[in-house]
């Protein structure tokens, strides 16, 4: 997890730095519903490369936003879910969803 000194002073800039990429926001959108496996996430995010998905998941795990759970099974199973800190993003994602709906309705008039 990054230290306070490594993050921008502005809280909005901090949020953008941690989760502001297109893919991270869409990953969070999915993870707010349920835990997902890597291949499920990749299939649900049209256009994302394995490298970008891997980098995004590792970054959010390192920042304490998501949890990577490895199950001791054969074959191995790994799931990604929101951490308690990541769950605090749910109202933000829902607000973005509502804003997107409203924007589309206005543009359709």
Give, region by region, the residue ranges found by the protein language model.
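Basic, amphipathic "hinge/linker" alpha-helix immediately C-terminal to the N-terminal HTH DNA-binding motif
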Residues: 72-95
